[in-house]
Amino acid sequence: MRLVLISLDAVFSRDADFLLSLPNLGALAGRGVFCDRVQTIYPTLTYPVHTSLVTGCYPNRHGIGHNELFMPAIKPGRRLWYWDASHIRSDTLFTRAKMAGRTSAAILWPVTGHSGAIRYNLPEVLALPGENQLIKALRFGSAWWMIKNELLFGSKRKGKQQPQLDEYAALVAAKLIKREYAPGERFGPEGDINPSRRDEQRHMPDILALHLVDCDDARHRYGTDSIEARQAMIRLDLRVGQIMAALLGRKAMDETVLAVVSDHGQADVLGTLPLDSWLLANAVPARAQTLGLGAYLHIKRGDYLPVLKALKDNMAKLHIKHIYTREELRFMQAPEDILLAVEPEEGIMIVDDEQEEVPAATHGFGVDHPGAQCLMWLSGPMFPADTRLESCKIVDIAPTLAYAVGLSLPGAQGRVLEEIIKNPAPEDAQKADLA
């Protein structure tokens, strides 16, 4: 049993009715299970959430607590991100698949750089000032395979601009799925008269993860409810349709789990708060690291109480809605080294640098925000058709997918959604457990 996992970045519960009205995502909901109340993690940032999507763990276990490394001395736009798979401290679907002898592919999936578990790897990495985007991606990914794709589809891409980048990514994914069986290359000029099903599909990866960013880009640039965001969602539906068509054309739909998920929503930005500058100006022994619509406070343990008092005394002045204490952060299973965090009033974005560019919308809010309710479609022979799941957690997705395709994630903090699985694939579960 194969797995195709597609992430629709920055779509959320409020988008459900519109997305279900579109031809491909609507049809996919009819083929299997749909849920519009998938509780995401804290923080609501792309890299931590996408790591949870493939580990079933919270940041306190998988180790990815932010998109960027904490580098306060370096200006925004020049900081390193968590691009490398070695940053992840727990097993992923990719590592467990490799233990079970399966192949994986990842296309623009966060935190996959230099992964030894992914055979076909086009990682999401961003060129910093002075770097070349293509050369950097080749260094972090499967270079020769990426070069072949660039020769085939490079004309479709305009750097990292959307929607062309998503179009390129979907073409690469569909090409992987549609790779033709070529018996003459393996068995001689007369070919293999009766190839096995596995031989027929030997080039299609067992796990394929695809990250589509069009809607996230549109919302950051134009706003949460912009026409451009609505148009991006229509394009996302077309991309999902491309993948479904490739699976149907390969006659692999009935032997594949197709999962479409999201990571977080967004909310419009109405103003900014330079919290780190305020801390420095007022000699508060802490440094802020923006999450967007929230921030971490990096402090020494001995400074916890004075920093907490300084924040409480200035909540109204700073337009802070909520201060997350260390107890609340431990309950949310946020990174263990974060002892304090804040969430400002609705629409206030915390900035690390007063000169940085401010988007029209962003995320990074707490788990009680409406944008923290995400979406999930699950289709495959083990999932009942036309079924609504009332709610689940985003950390439940990876162990459920692993179980459905005969793998396991014994370190996952989420649970297997057994109530929506009829017959899981047993083939490699025991082998993976023993690996």
Language model: regions and residue ranges:
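Anion (oxyanion) recognition and catalysis
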Residues: A29, K98-M99, A252
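Active-site metal-binding loops of divalent metal-dependent hydrolases
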Residues: D9-A10, S262-G265, E346
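Long, internal low-complexity/basic segments
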Residues: S391, A402, G414-A435
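Short, structured active-site-proximal loop/turn typified by the sulfatase FGly-forming signature C/S-X-P-X-R
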Residues: A16-R61, A105
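Active-site neighborhoods of enzymes that stabilize oxyanions during catalysis
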Residues: A288-T400, D428
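His/Asp/Glu-rich, glycine-adjacent segments
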Residues: C57-G223, A316, V351
